[in-house]
UniProtKB/Swiss-Prot annotation:
Biological role stated in the UniProt entry: Required for retention of late Golgi membrane proteins. Component of the retrieval machinery that functions by direct interaction with the cytosolic tails of certain TGN membrane proteins during the sorting/budding process at the prevacuolar compartment. Binds phosphatidylinositol 3-phosphate (PtdIns(P3)).
Annotated family: Belongs to the sorting nexin family.
List of residues binding a 1,2-diacyl-sn-glycero-3-phospho-(1D-myo-inositol-3-phosphate): 83, 85, 114, 120, 129
This protein's name: Sorting nexin-3
Major location category of this protein: cytoplasm
Gene Ontology terms describing biological process: endocytic recycling; late endosome to Golgi transport; protein transport
Topology class, membrane: Peripheral membrane protein
InterPro entries in the cross-refs: PX_dom, PX_dom_sf, Sorting_Nexin
Length: 164
């Protein structure tokens, strides 16, 4: 379980674009209904691994939890684990996908920087990176064109065997 159950939710409903005055006129049941289209995503639960029993092979991965009802996603809820290098590959493939699909105006931000310090496995550093990756993925997943048209985004968020 993620320590803070605070999903980033992105809706693409007509109701989400209504004015404040119109919103007040909606019934209580309508206001609290599930949005027509939504994508909730969170990067959480970092876990450090020691595959060879020594510090040389150590790495940290992060759980990505997703809930959605967008038609392009095959699963309504999913949980996968990703390393920082997976995020790097995802960003590279996403930029390539955007260029090929003629959407060069969609800007993909840089990832939070690589950590090259000896304390990169400290709890504070890992939490800082988790927060940075969560913010970065929220900005990517929150883009309407990527929510509805990126096959790379869907694979990264939902395919446990994501290899690019």
């Amino acid at each position: 379980m993620c320590p803070q159950r605070q999903f980033q939710s992105f809706t693409t409903t007509a109701e989400s674009t209504l004015s404040h005055t119109t919103h007040k006129q909606l019934s209580g049941a309508t206001i609290y209904d599930e949005p027509e289209n939504f994508l909730e995503i969170e990067v959480c639960n970092p876990k450090t691994h020691f595959p060879s029993g020594d510090a040389k092979g150590m790495y940290t991965d992060y759980e990505i939890i997703c809930r959605t009802n967008l038609p392009g996603f095959s699963k309504r809820s999913s949980s996968v684990r990703r390393r920082y290098s997976d995020f790097e590959l995802f960003r590279k493939l996403l930029i390539k996908e955007l260029q090929l699909s003629n959407h060069p105006k969609v800007s993909v931000q840089h990832l939070p920087g690589k950590i090259l310090l000896s304390n990169r496995f400290s709890d504070a550093v890992i939490e800082e990176r988790r927060q940075g990756l969560n913010k970065w993925l929220a900005s990517v997943a929150g883009h309407p064109l990527l929510q509805t048209g990126s096959k790379v985004l869907v694979r990264f968020i939902q395919d446990p065997t994501f290899q690019g």
